[in-house]
Regions:
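Charged, long alpha-helical assembly modules
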Residues: 177, 184-265
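Phenylalanine-focused residue identity feature
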Residues: 5, 68-70, 122, 175, ...
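C-terminal motif of bacterial Sec signal peptides marking the signal peptidase cleavage site
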Residues: 21-25
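Hydrophobic helical h-region of N-terminal Sec-dependent signal peptides
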Residues: 15, 19-20
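A non-transmembrane, solvent-exposed segment enriched in polar/low-complexity residues
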Residues: 26-169
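Short, structured coil/loop segments at alpha-helix boundaries
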Residues: 112-120, 146, 150-154, 181-182, ...
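Amphipathic alpha-helical coiled-coil segments
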Residues: 161-179, 199-204
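Bacterial N-terminal signal peptides that target proteins for export
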Residues: 2-14
Length: 265
């Protein structure tokens, strides 16, 4: 095969280097936010990483007249957490472009860039399923108060719950698969597995990994989770000795899908 690099002139190489420097220098994040929540003015908010036992601060700013802004150089595209004090408020994808954040009593929204728009759309869809799931309990209580046949009611609600859980699995699995090769895939994977007491291999995880890309499989957090889950399965089947591997190094403050689906206070 012909080595095309040898055909490049010194001028071509210089132009390429200049272009790379220009692109790198233009890569930055710019977050413009607003909030009308009481007690927010004058307080400091932070952007923090999601890796490590102690999340590291990336940026901080004060809220002035309900407005705040972060901006800086972008080393890599990643999901970070917007925090006030030690409370996580919402995830944000730190990526190139102008990111718009709104925090109010009705909604929490982040958009303006491709990955943030995608994450917000996923969160909204998940929230709709969570609300439908909550309605099942309300329907059950209402049926009991109305003196309905609870055996029939519970059968009907169990079927509805199963259908919603199937939709939830499909929504989460499809979103992760669509984002295997960016930061959203691993992030949502761990949101979905936060409810597990320990790493396990569920049918949806096994199905997901059969089509996962190498980039996703080799993500350090994904790889550590899968190794721990496989070890746990081997222990349960008697293949391995009881020796629990370390849990994946993921902070406990990451909101789960259920957390994100809760109505804002």
């Amino acid at each position: 095969m012909k080595n095309n690099f040898t055909t490049l002139s010194i001028a071509d190489v210089c132009l390429a280097i200049i272009a790379m420097v220009t692109i790198t220098s233009c890569t930055k994040y710019d977050i413009i936010g607003s909030s009308d929540l009481q007690g927010v003015d004058g307080r400091m908010i932070y952007l923090r990483t999601l890796t490590g036992e102690t999340p590291q601060g990336i940026d901080s700013c004060d809220v002035v007249h309900g407005k705040f802004r972060f901006s800086g150089a972008l080393d890599s595209v990643q999901v970070v957490m917007l925090c006030m004090d030690n409370n996580a408020m919402m995830p944000i994808v730190l990526e190139d472009g102008k990111i718009k954040v709104e925090i109010n009593a009705q909604k929490i929204m982040c958009g303006g860039t491709p990955l943030n728009d995608s994450l917000t759309s996923f969160t909204n869809n998940y929230r709709q399923l969570a609300m439908q799931m909550a309605d099942l309990e309300h329907t059950q209580n209402q049926a009991y108060m109305n003196g309905e046949d609870m055996d029939e009611v519970n059968k009907r609600l169990a079927l509805a719950e199963r259908e919603l859980l199937i939709k939830e699995d499909k929504l989460v699995s499809r979103f992760i698969a669509d984002n295997f090769d960016n930061c959203l895939g691993p992030y949502v994977f761990f949101m979905a597995t936060q409810a597990y007491e320990y790493p396990i291999l569920t049918p949806w995880i096994e199905a997901l990994m059969t089509k996962a890309t190498d980039a996703f499989k080799n993500n350090p957090i994904i790889k550590e989770y899968m190794e721990a889950a496989q070890h746990n399965q081997d222990v349960m089947t008697g293949v391995a000795d009881v020796q629990q591997p370390a849990m994946p190094d993921v902070p406990t403050h990451v909101p789960t899908p259920n957390d994100m689906a809760k109505p804002e206070k």
